């Protein structure tokens, strides 16, 4: 399970964020990006020593200052369910056209077929001689 997929699933859920400097932030996750920057709403910030508290309507936390995240167990279960659901798909389903197997049709965009070299030089190109 990748951390960013876990955070995307945790949107709207409460979570605890501890920073490297010891401060903790409790709030509801609004959004996160690929650098793990986090936007929280209804936040309670606790100081490093735990004796001061601040209530904020929202806050933004830079990803490289985060020490760890605590998300509810229901979010982790939800991510695992989604992973097992996608793992059960038959191979090739929902994966685009792909290369597939040889069906005897045209194969790519090259300079022609092997018959062009064996038979007379018909078609494009100047040829030799």
Swiss-Prot record:
PTM per Swiss-Prot/TrEMBL: Methylated by PMRT15/SKB1 in response to salt stress or abscisic acid (ABA) treatment.
GO molecular function: RNA binding
Region (Disordered): 79-129
Tissues in which the UniProt entry reports expression: Expressed in roots, leaves, stems, flowers and siliques.
InterPro entries the UniProt entry points to: Lsm4, LSm4/Sm_D1/D3, LSM_dom_sf, Sm, Sm_dom_euk/arc
Cellular compartments per GO CC: cytosol; Lsm1-7-Pat1 complex; Lsm2-8 complex; nucleus; P-body; plastid; spliceosomal complex
Ranges that cross the membrane: none
Keyword Cytoplasm carried by entry: yes
Biased composition regions of type Gly residues, renumbered to the chain: 111-129
Oligomeric form and interacting partners: Component of the heptameric LSM1-LSM7 complex that forms a seven-membered ring structure with a donut shape. The LSM subunits are arranged in the order LSM1, LSM2, LSM3, LSM6, LSM5, LSM7 and LSM4. LSM4 subunit interacts only with its two neighboring subunits, LSM1A or LSM1B and LSM7. Component of the heptameric LSM2-LSM8 complex that forms a seven-membered ring structure with a donut shape. The LSM subunits are arranged in the order LSM8, LSM2, LSM3, LSM6, LSM5, LSM7 and LSM4. LSM4 subunit interacts only with its two neighboring subunits, LSM8 and LSM7.
Protein family according to the UniProt entry: Belongs to the snRNP Sm proteins family.
PANTHER family in UniProt: SMALL NUCLEAR RIBONUCLEOPROTEIN SM
Name by which UniProt lists this protein: Sm-like protein LSM4
Species of the source: Arabidopsis thaliana (Mouse-ear cress)
